[in-house]
Structure formats: structure tokens, C-alpha cells
């Protein structure tokens, strides 16, 4: 059994600004069933699905540096790379682990290990912080027969990520 005094946590309780509710929201974002969506009054177990919906974001795979350094004109970015030792940077990072990036409607940019598929980290841009409480929807049914609970999509990190290596001479 869980903490039955908190079993009825709701959106209004996270909006009251109590420190425990703010921590609960953070733990909810990390996958904890803080709002008891499965109805077992255990607010510490892991939700079955906690990645936000991916509607508009393309998946981006980033691995070893692959920017071109062959050029035909000194007005090309490749010219700058070729004349500033990009090839050393690229060879230094040739074994960089492949990572999958995708934006989701939970307000986060997610990074996944390409080989294992597990989440490595997620980033919440500062402009999304005020929107996070809007994820909680205690009236949304997720199964049949359903306990109440689910999440609303919050748009803001649902665009496609882009990749560009940042190469600065003297910094590896």
C-alpha cells in the first residue's frame, strides 16, 4: 500500500506551490505515479508509459562527426573546417556513441542510447517550466476499466531537433 493520505493528489494540489507537490511533479515527469493514475494508492511506483506523445518531431540520430571539409571556394563552411584542423577534431570524436534525440509533447527533448534504447537524459527548456503542471489530467482515462488519469499534450518541444557539431580550435 502507498501513502493513502496523498492518494487523492490532484492538479489543484500541484498548483498550490507546496514544495512536496512540486517535487511530486518532478518525480511524475521522471516516471513516478505521483498522481496515482493506476489507482493502487502507491505514489512511488513507476508508470507503465511516461514518454510524452511524439507528434511532429522527427527522430535525429547523432554519432561521429561527419561534417564535410572538402571545399571548392573559401566562402564555404567546409573551407573554414579544412583550414582550422576539423579533421583532428573529427578523428578525436570518431568513436562518439550514437544517440537518438526527439522532442515530445511532455515539454522535453529526450536523448536515448542508440544501441540499448534506454533514455540517457531529458532536457526541459526554461520556457516550458510554467507549462508543466498542464500535463496533469486526472480525468483522462488510460485503460478500460480505467482509473482516472493521463496527461495532456503540451506543445513547445515538439519540433524536430537539428544537429551541428561545434568545433572551436583548441577545445576538444
Regions found by a protein language model. Give the residues of each.
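A fold-level detector for beta-propeller and closely related beta-sheet-rich head/sensor domains
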Residues: 1-172
Amino acid at each position: 500500500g502507498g501513502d493513502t493520505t496523498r492518494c487523492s493528489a490532484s492538479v489543484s494540489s500541484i498548483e498550490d506551490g507546496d514544495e512536496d507537490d512540486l517535487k511530486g511533479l518532478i518525480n511524475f515527469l521522471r516516471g513516478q505515479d505521483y498522481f496515482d493514475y493506476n489507482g493502487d494508492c502507491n505514489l512511488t511506483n513507476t508508470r507503465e508509459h511516461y514518454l510524452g506523445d511524439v507528434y511532429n518531431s522527427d527522430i535525429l540520430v547523432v554519432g561521429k562527426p561527419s561534417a564535410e571539409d572538402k571545399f571548392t571556394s573559401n566562402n564555404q563552411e567546409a573551407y573554414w573546417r579544412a583550414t582550422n584542423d576539423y579533421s583532428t577534431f573529427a578523428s578525436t570524436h570518431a568513436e562518439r556513441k550514437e544517440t537518438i534525440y526527439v522532442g515530445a509533447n511532455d515539454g522535453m527533448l529526450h536523448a536515448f542510447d542508440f544501441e540499448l534504447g534506454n533514455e540517457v537524459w531529458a532536457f526541459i527548456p526554461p520556457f516550458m517550466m510554467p507549462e508543466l503542471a498542464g500535463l496533469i489530467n486526472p480525468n483522462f482515462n488510460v485503460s478500460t476499466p480505467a482509473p482516472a488519469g493521463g496527461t495532456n499534450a503540451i506543445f513547445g518541444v515538439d519540433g524536430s531537433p537539428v544537429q551541428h557539431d561545434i568545433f572551436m580550435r583548441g577545445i576538444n
